[in-house]
Regions:
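Active-site-adjacent loop/helix surface patches within enzyme catalytic domains
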Residues: 1-117
């Protein structure tokens, strides 16, 4: 699966990804909604919340919104926790309704993660 880069502007690093990092692994989440990867990335990049993640994957595409050498606020373990500081955050789309789109998004995420590792 190819990864589309649509990286956040560096002026938002202080809010969304303030620390450089060397990733130790990948932390996978479900979005708990039915938005596309493009919509997930757009919302994450444009809102005023620090909550962030690196990649969103849906049934058609995978989009990277943050540099993989910067942290993201996705794991809920604060500023010093390893989840946020050392793991790439991947969001799988369409988890609210499930079904074929969600299953394809899971397959796409597995393929992408295998490529990253």
């Amino acid at each position: 699966m190819s990864l589309i880069q649509r990286l956040i502007s560096s002026d938002k690093y202080s809010l969304k990804c303030p620390y450089s990092m060397t990733p130790k692994g990948i932390c996978i989440h479900n979005t708990a909604n039915d938005a596309t990867a493009s919509n997930e990335i757009s919302y994450m990049q444009s809102n005023a919340s620090s909550t962030s993640f690196h990649i969103a994957v849906d049934d058609n595409e995978a989009i990277q919104g943050l540099p993989l050498n910067r942290n993201a606020w996705h794991a809920g373990d604060g500023e010093i926790g390893e989840g946020n500081r050392y793991y790439i955050g991947v969001e799988i789309c369409y988890s609210k309704s499930g079904g074929e789109k969600f299953l394809k998004a899971e397959d796409n995420a597995a393929s992408l993660i295998a490529d990253i590792l």
